[in-house]
Amino acid sequence: MSRPSHLLEPHRVEVRTVRVEGSAHRERGLARGRMLAEQIRETSAGYARLFARKGIGAADHRAAAVACLDALREWHPGLHDEAAGIAEGAGLDLAELGTTLARTEILTLVPDPPSECSTVTYQQPGGSVSAQTWDWYAAFATSWHRQEVVPLPGEHAHRGFTEYGMPGKIGLNAAGVGVHLNILRQRDDRPGGVPVHGVLARVLAEAGTVAEAVEMIRSAPMSSSSLLTVVGADEVVMVEVAAGRTALLQRDGWLVHTNHFLAPELQDGAMLTDPASTTHERLAHLEEGIGSAPAPGGVGDLVPLLCSAPELNCVARLPDPAQPAQDRMATLATVLMDPARERVEVSPGIPQHAPA
């Protein structure tokens, strides 16, 4: 029997674009859940299988999901209501939805949580731009979609992509604030904090400036480690989160990041996401590229920096057919952001297939 093409060629995935709206958080969640019910249930079940393969029992991942959802309710009741609506609309209980929404936090229960994303940015007045690869299991290559979210009163419309069941992930809002995500790892990581994907959703919906986004991130009691890169037309700020502590990285011109801590003040307890991580090799590849690169004329100029030769298993990553299908990692999407031009482009697969 032939394998589904996405297991070896994620760029061939037909990505759905959906418009999500509702009169309140819960109603918007219900609308999302009903519209995408089958895919939301499939994604939740896929994460349950992943956790089982990693040795996380059903009771443990459910307890972790509930703890993270409780933290989300304390931090932002509206987002908790939206998550409850998504679950109801999709025919899941809330803890089952939490296996997706809090999957980053749940994976802190294993010694080698995978995720190998690479981000490149350029800061200049009126023309800051950013791009990233999103690397994940090839088995989840069909578990994400583009979206356009209609704002509630006091919110901003936003566009980008998310996984089925999450209200937000990576994107750009109508105020010109964008956000990227890279996973980091620290010895104190654990489940139970606000899910980082809930934080991303709030930034996209509510942040009117880069400074507001940074303060939202710093206000969230997260228990896992991540890099959240906030992009506006005039500035780029990378926020490293180490299980509750934060550090900011910012400078004019080029700034790149992969999956290990760069801030000196967060080195105590810093770890690789996986002993086999390529984070240092990918950072070196990006730094070599920006070393001779002129200021970008547009976000398309960032794409070549991400286009490492696929056979190198570096920034641009194809599934390894020699590995078991469920273990294959790959670049599932490439994201380009240009806040000044109100542009966010999300394309499936390695950056070689991204629009210039």
Name the predicted role of every residue range.
Residues 1-116, 206-227, 232-238, 242-243, ...:
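C-terminus-biased signal that marks the final domain/tail of proteins
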Residues 102-194, 198, 332-335, 344-346, ...:
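Internal mixed beta-strand/loop scaffold within catalytic domains of large alpha/beta enzymes
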Residues 201-205:
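Short, well-ordered beta-strand elements within core beta-sheets of diverse protein domains
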Residues 246-253:
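Acidic, Ser/Thr-rich peripheral helices and adjacent loops at domain boundaries
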